[in-house]
């Protein structure tokens, strides 16, 4: 008799994982604490409840990374994408969903599946035996979170996001910015040039502070937190403490020499640090923020060298429970310390409904394959799913790991021989390559 797979959490990731494993012939026990134990964000006990936006973002699978992820999930017969398409709302090129019928249909399909049984209970600690997928999301219960912390180490779980904006490297004006680590620290050339620096004059700095203070901000949601941790203060809060605070904090100019104008002394410097091994993404150091998204783009484009910046992710601070996955998970999403346990979804450090469901899809398939005596490798990094799982299980820098949406900066660069591609053509090249690779992976 085939042994059962236990899945904890029936959000996007857990629901998709359960569906995939059951469709492969593996019995699934799906554990969900709602509605018996609620959270401040959920309204119902339905599976895959959309607690924030009702959008799955762009459905363009030719020129958009999340649209490509939609395509891959459809190709893999994903339940979440099937139900999203069935309850689609008019939204231009985006995939918007009628959230309540969507959740109801996901719940019905899972409860009706002959190989899926649902247990309405809270799991309070990590199990020591059996096959498990933990897909409890950013609102993991405090008891389970404490158990995860105890097993993996005190620093392995973050309960509060300090998310800095991430910029595509190709959109940074390097005729203004330059590469240098503070005081030229580092033993190798890569280390000595690990940061991109954007200089500001006094007037530019003062205008930037004015814009920060005037920008629209979002407030913490009830149940998140009543205040800030000093280690991840929003830049606008630092500015409120004094106009010079940032210049003596993340924007301090010391130890840096402008490679373009060595005689000029910057009044302040904004630093960007590489965010992935490919060097295609850079985060703005110390720039966690609660500014609204529209305000962020206008304020951050005031920074010299970032006037035409393209953002892979904007900043934010909010409660989030997620693992330091590059340190703790192997490439099959197994916990290295307890390989019988996999993690999936937002708790692994991906951001967004679709990304969470995609990691659930992979975890469900990988766990089912293992139970059936087979090994299923992750998709190639040229695919959207492969790029995401590669990022969270080793491609990201462990010391600065933060939740990430899918974006083309996670993919291995496209060979641009024959001239520089236009952006749209380059994106099409990414998606065409990904579709071929994903189709081959599915067939294998």
Swiss-Prot record:
Its EC number is 2.1.1.74. The keyword Aminoacyl-tRNA synthetase does not apply. Its cofactor is FAD. Pfam families: GIDA. It is found in: Cytoplasm. One of its GO terms (cellular component) is cytosol. PROSITE patterns: GIDA_2. It catalyses: uridine(54) in tRNA + (6R)-5,10-methylene-5,6,7,8-tetrahydrofolate + NADH + H(+) = 5-methyluridine(54) in tRNA + (6S)-5,6,7,8-tetrahydrofolate + NAD(+); uridine(54) in tRNA + (6R)-5,10-methylene-5,6,7,8-tetrahydrofolate + NADPH + H(+) = 5-methyluridine(54) in tRNA + (6S)-5,6,7,8-tetrahydrofolate + NADP(+). Gene3D superfamilies: FAD/NAD(P)-binding domain (3.50.50.60). Keywords: Cytoplasm, FAD, Flavoprotein, Methyltransferase, NAD, NADP, Transferase, tRNA processing. Catalyzes the folate-dependent formation of 5-methyl-uridine at position 54 (M-5-U54) in all tRNAs. This is Methylenetetrahydrofolate--tRNA-(uracil-5-)-methyltransferase TrmFO. It comes from Cereibacter sphaeroides (strain ATCC 17025 / ATH 2.4.3) (Rhodobacter sphaeroides). The gene is trmFO.
